[in-house]
Amino acid sequence: MKIVGTGSCLPQRVVSNDDLAAIMDTSDEWISSRTGIRNRHIATTETTTSLACDAVKSALQDAGIDGSEIDLIIAASVSTDKIVPSLACQIQAEIGAGSAVAFDINAACSG
């Protein structure tokens, strides 16, 4: 077993610390000095499934392989769109990895 490609996907909407400071009693300096965070991506139209599928498609492209060549899909998230089918099985269907083993790991912070 090996990882042959990686991919990522972020929601389109970006909310900055200044955006937050405009609606609550805080500042960019206060947030960033305590957390290191300056911006965050907020999913408004995207779902966990759509983001995961886009990230997997990016990883497949990076690896130069087709979804049908995948043997195993493990999805790790506690914020799935639905309980059934699992996120991994939704990815499996989207990329055409019909013969792959697919399952989710839902372990929150302990994962």
Where are each of the predicted segments found?
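Conserved "HGTGT" condensation-loop signature of ketosynthase/thiolase-family condensing enzymes
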Residues: 1-71, 93-96
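Short beta-strand segments
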Residues: 4-7, 76, 106
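Active-site nucleophile and cofactor-binding loops and adjacent substrate-binding regions
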Residues: 45, 103-111
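Short glycine-rich or small-residue beta-strand-to-loop segments that form or flank ligand, phosphate
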Residues: 71-77
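Short Gly/Thr/Asp-enriched flexible loops that form oxyanion-binding sites at enzyme active sites
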Residues: 79-92
